Amino acid sequence: MYYTMKETCEMANMTYEALKYYCNVGLIPNVKRDKNNHRVFDENNINWIKSLSCLKNCGMSIKEMQAYLKLCLQGEQTIPERQEMLEEQKYNLIKKLEEIQESLKYIDKKQKFYNQVLNGEVEYHSYLIDTSKKS
């Protein structure tokens, strides 16, 4: 079964512009055309497009995705290189996750402080303005 660009975008949760761009830069191999010369996609294309979305969300650049695709098209013998690329992306994601967790800790701490101030449990202080009471 073949799907239109619009259907493929919906299935892959991707914008029409992004899908068209990925096609134009050669990131989606083996795309067929219908009798009106419109691109049509099969299940294999859609699964690959979903993989591209994941790689993009990992922070992989277009150039890196093109290199990954090239390795994929060479077959099983390139699995070690692909594993290495994915390991690097995983490392980057773990670092990002750690940064996000630190940011969440900061926000939780600030929210707790603000709640304590609003409840009259602690006195408000600021690093930015002078909050000392002048007599």
What are these regions (language model features)?
Residues 76-135:
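C-terminal regulatory/oligomerization modules of transcriptional regulators
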